[in-house]
A protein has these predicted regions:
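A eukaryote-biased signal for short, well-structured alpha-helical docking elements
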Residues: 15-57, 191-230
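C-terminal functional regions that serve as terminal interaction/effector modules
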Residues: 12-20, 259-348
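Intrinsically disordered, low-complexity Pro/Gly/Ser/Thr-rich segments with frequent PxxP/GP/PP motifs
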Residues: 111-147, 286-317
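Short, solvent-exposed loop/turn segments enriched in Ser/Thr/Gly
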Residues: 73-81, 150-154, 249-255, 316
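Short, hydrophobic/aromatic beta-strand segments
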Residues: 79-81, 90-98, 166-169, 264-271, ...
């Protein structure tokens, strides 16, 4: 049984291991998927940065989102900075609508998880006006210091009423980031092609059919899997080459579901791809709840574990929102299971 009712403060949690019997018997759910939302700038290659330079750069207008994930791979202290620049003649109104940043730290999964917790929290917009040639640095105004082998990661949503150039860079601690951005060289990717610009970075899933709770069956939905064709495709703006977002990092998933019947169900998450540490948001009955997945630092070493997110009331509908966390593995599966489901090897 699940550790808490939706819309009621959590008093515990339930985690299960399914190694002997396998994951619960289930029917695969189908959903209609609509891609919309901001243009995504994805900066994760090189992940381990061994020299100073430009990590990613592109120009965009309108709704934007930046996901960055970089480790200082040098033996000396460095600085990571994000520069927004107006190269046009007319003033730009630039607004950061939402952000979640964490680090630096050696605990990469903890940083990825905490940055999502910050991102999903309620927050106020931050407005700026940039004149011709003016810049704005998004990590505290001057960049953030990054010690050796430590990670800094985050997601920043923004809106610009005119084109702006966005640059992610790493430089020495005392370097003028604005001048460096104008003169530094573009660094090549590492062996993992994880950078690019992608349109419509919100994926909205609507289950094609209501979940029939009277049948007492289990249901599952596979997400962020390389075989489903859902990984965003775009362009590496620094090279002009095609790009694919392996893992859909920086993509927001919204899953709308509806329960039909008088029996309560539970929503579970299975980290099928391996170790996972993230955050989700459950909305139901006018309430919004941020949930750590799992409550412990991470789980999923076996790929056959489950975390009970919430108990869902009969004849209810809701939305579950999540995003692939930096340093976690994919894909995942969501399970809708009867509330009297007895999970093996429970950890409370």
């Amino acid at each position: 049984m699940c550790g808490f009712l939706v819309n009621v403060p959590a008093t515990g949690f339930t985690q299960a291991v399914w190694t002997e019997q396998g994951v619960p018997e289930h029917q695969e759910l189908r959903a209609k998927v609509k891609a919309e939302g901001p243009k995504l700038l994805f900066s994760d290659s090189p992940e381990m940065v061994y020299e100073t330079g430009i990590l990613y750069r592109d120009t965009l207008q309108g709704e934007g989102r930046l996901f960055f994930h970089h480790v200082n791979g040098t033996s000396k202290l460095k600085k990571l900075a994000i520069i927004v620049k107006n190269n046009g003649l007319r003033p730009v109104n630039f607004t950061v609508t939402r952000s979640g940043i964490d680090g630096p730290s050696h605990d990469y999964q903890a940083v990825g998880k905490k940055s999502q917790e910050y991102y999903f929290e309620e927050q106020k917009s931050k407005n700026s006006t940039l004149g011709f040639g003016k810049t704005l640095e998004l990590l505290g105004g001057e960049g953030m210091l990054l010690p050796t082998d430590q990670l800094l990661t985050g997601t920043i949503d923004f809106f610009s009423d005119r084109p702006v150039e966005v640059t992610v860079l790493m430089c020495d601690p005392k370097t003028d980031v604005e001048l460096f951005s104008a003169l530094a060289k573009q660094l090549p990717m590492d062996e993992h092609p994880l950078r690019g610009t992608f349109v419509k970075a919100d994926l909205n899933y609507k289950l094609q059919h209501s979940i029939d709770t009277e049948a007492g069956a289990g249901y599952a939905l596979l997400l962020a899997d390389s075989q489903t064709g859902e990984y965003l495709r775009g362009t590496d703006a620094t090279t002009g080459l095609p790009a694919e977002n392996y893992g859909n990092y920086g993509v927001i998933y919204n899953i709308d579901y509806k329960l039909k019947g008088d029996k309560p169900y539970e929503l579970w998450l299975n980290p099928w791809g391996g170790m996972f540490a993230g955050v989700g948001v459950l909305e139901q009955g006018g309430q919004r709840k941020i949930i750590n997945i799992p409550e412990s630092p991470a789980f999923g070493r076996l790929g056959e574990e489950g975390f009970c997110i919430a108990r869902l009331e009969p004849n209810s509908e809701g939305r579950f929102t999540w995003s692939p966390p930096g340093a976690s593995n994919l894909p995942i599966r969501l399970f809708w299971l009867p509330s009297d489901y007895e999970a093996p090897y429970l950890h409370d």
